[in-house]
Amino acid sequence: AKATGRLAKTDVLDAHVLAHFAEGVRPQPRAMPDAQARELTSILARRRQVVEMLTAEDNRLRRASNPVRKRIRAHIGWLERELTDINKDLGRIVKESPAWSEKDSLLRSTPGVGPILSITLLADLPELGSLNRKQIAALVGVAPLNRDSGTMRGKRTVWGGRARVRSA
């Protein structure tokens, strides 16, 4: 609302600002993810959390005193079993969907693409297959972007995009 010169902020004003934005910019409508896509995204997010916890516990184990090591090892064992179960769930969900199963097979036929990268791309980059490679690169945040103005020619840098896809 401030950009339009209004200092007040209410739901009604916000609705007007959003309507004005939609009129001028005409953003492309996007379909809401279905229940299966939300489930895949949710389980994949949990997988990332478990991997982070495993890394943290492994780091703690290196510095822990002997009495604490046994407990940390037990927790690492539990986290590894949890990770195995999560990976099985992710594979099951992908196999249950004919569209995902087909895309998964195609992605995994590429050298260097394993099950987790493939599932990450399916969950976090649903546009894959409907956009060209330059559009996908920009969406992920790996396409160099110009920073030019007038006679100034800036360095082409990559930024923004979907960090979860880049880190997969």
What is each residue range found by the language model?
Residues 1-110, 119-120:
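Long, charge-rich intrinsically disordered scaffolds of nucleic-acid metabolism proteins
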Residues 115, 120-168:
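Phosphate-backbone recognition surface of nucleic-acid-processing proteins
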